[in-house]
A protein has these predicted regions:
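A short, glycine- and basic residue-enriched loop/turn
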Residues: 146-147, 164-165, 180, 186
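Histidine/lysine/aspartate-rich catalytic loop segments that bind and position anionic ligands
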Residues: 109-141
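Conserved beta-strand positions that form and line the central face of beta-propeller blades
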Residues: 178, 188, 196
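Short conserved catalytic/interaction loops centered on acidic-Pro-aromatic/His motifs
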Residues: 123-130, 167-170, 184-186
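A short acidic, glycine-rich active-site loop
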Residues: 78-83, 135-147
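Short hydrophobic beta-strand segments in globular cytosolic domains
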Residues: 156, 162, 174, 179-180
């Protein structure tokens, strides 16, 4: 009986994987996503925004399923473009159930790892002026600044990277941290707000 159940689960999983591949390919075509070689996607990616640009490099792995990363982050990977925003993802990068929202630009280098549930927003979404916020249907006063994550950086699970942030090459951001500013290369930062912990030797 256990073997029968195992075989049924395997067959259902294969069908589901095929459907996900078709779904993602249609999404990429519709949203004109530029894709490099050997992209691997586990689950379905959600994309929003018909303007702007999304570029995915070579040998990128994207997990977008509760089954792909069983550590408590069950949302799908989301690429959300506001206006002419840009999301650029370098080669040999991996991410799991992340949310990237760009009004300006999000640039992710080569060899970067984004842990489960990481959120990267280059926009405030709403104005800090309460008068402008009274009309929830307007984006008036919404501010945005580019985000840069340099090569080989590692962003720990549950972290949030806010507008204007720069994460230096090879630096590590501890889990559940909030970054709003510049993290130099070869350093470990953690906390809310994220603070310097130590250099990486």
């Amino acid at each position: 009986m256990r073997e029968l159940i195992k075989n049924i689960r395997k067959a259902v999983g294969s069908i589901g994987s095929f459907i996900n591949v078709v779904y993602n390919k249609l999404h990429f075509i519709y949203y004109k996503v530029m894709i490099g070689k050997s992209l691997k996607v586990n689950g379905r990616i959600k994309i929003s925004g018909t303007k702007g640009k999304i570029v995915i490099g070579n040998n990128v792995v994207i997990n977008s399923s509760e089954y792909a990363i069983p550590i408590g982050y069950t949302c799908k990977t989301i690429f959300w473009i506001l206006g002419d925003g840009k999301i650029i993802i370098g080669d040999n990068t991996g991410m799991s159930n992340v949310a990237l929202c760009s009004q300006s630009s999000i640039s992710i280098g080569n060899g970067v790892l984004l842990g489960g549930g990481v959120k990267i927003y280059d926009t405030d979404f709403h104005s800090i002026n309460y008068i402008e916020r009274r009309n929830i249907n307007t984006d008036k006063g919404r501010k945005s600044k580019p985000i840069i994550i340099e090569d080989d950086a590692f962003i720990g699970a549950g972290s949030m990277i806010l507008k204007g942030s720069i994460i230096g090459a090879r630096s590590i951001i501890g889990a559940n941290s909030v970054v709003s500013g510049t993290v130099p290369a070869d350093e470990i930062w953690a906390g809310n707000p994220a603070k310097f912990i130590r250099k990486i030797e």
